[in-house]
Regions:
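Conserved cytosolic headpiece of P-type ATPases
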Residues: 1-205
Length: 205
């Protein structure tokens, strides 16, 4: 009977990644410095792009074991994006020490604390030690959530206030990505010492 009923179905709706697909995701586009780019167009020589990539692989629980990426599909896609950038740069620019493995970066910049993602906050944050005693919080999550938590936006040459003009540009790009069937994540950070708390997921850039 169930099979007969299924034969009459013309549309199946599902909100679970992997139900009807391969449970695999890939980073298609990145919006940085007021413009979009593909992962293979990014470079570790750009300080803004490099900082974004560090955010993507550090505030991330996916890992590589025996050449396979293991973990949440979204976080796995971010890890694969970093390798795509790194391998492409190896082929085209041969910049040596900049093209280091994500494992090396994770060892150089250790995770001190984390607040895992949950459906209420719609974001995930981790704290790291960069240079000496300097500590930084990396956050990723839903665009609308992080927009409300950010006070600045980073460009290659400057940090600008998150005013109505910047908010409108980001919202427009978010809508464009969504209309093209892409899942959209926002990334932010801030320097902060002391214990990592939910309250510190504010005042971000």
């Amino acid at each position: 009977k169930a099979v007969e009923s299924l034969g009459c179905v013309s549309v199946i709706c599902s909100d679970k990644t992997g139900t009807l697909t391969q449970n695999k995701m890939h980073v298609e586009e990145v919006y940085l410095n007021g413009m979009t780019c593909k992962p293979d167009e990014m470079t570790l020589e750009s300080s803004l792009q490099r900082f974004f990539l560090y955010n993507a692989i550090l505030n991330n629980d996916a890992s590589i074991t025996d050449g396979k990426v293991l973990g949440d599909p979204t976080e796995s896609a971010l890890l694969e994006m970093f390798h795509e950038v790194r391998l492409n740069q190896d082929r085209t620019e041969n910049v040596g020490q900049l093209t280091i493995q994500e494992e090396t970066i994770r060892n150089m910049i250790p995770r001190l604390e984390e607040i895992p993602f949950d459906s209420e906050r719609k974001c995930m944050s981790s704290k790291y030690r960069l240079h000496g005693e300097e500590e930084i919080i990396f956050t990723k999550g839903a665009v609308d959530v992080l927009l409300n938590r950010c006070i600045n936006v980073a460009y290659e040459e400057e940090i600008r206030p998150m005013d109505n003009v910047e908010i409108a540009k980001i919202q427009k790009q978010n809508q464009h990505f969504s209309e093209n069937g892409l899942r959209v994540l926002a990334f932010a950070c801030k320097k902060s010492g002391g214990e990592l708390t939910v309250e510190k997921e504010n005042g971000l850039t």
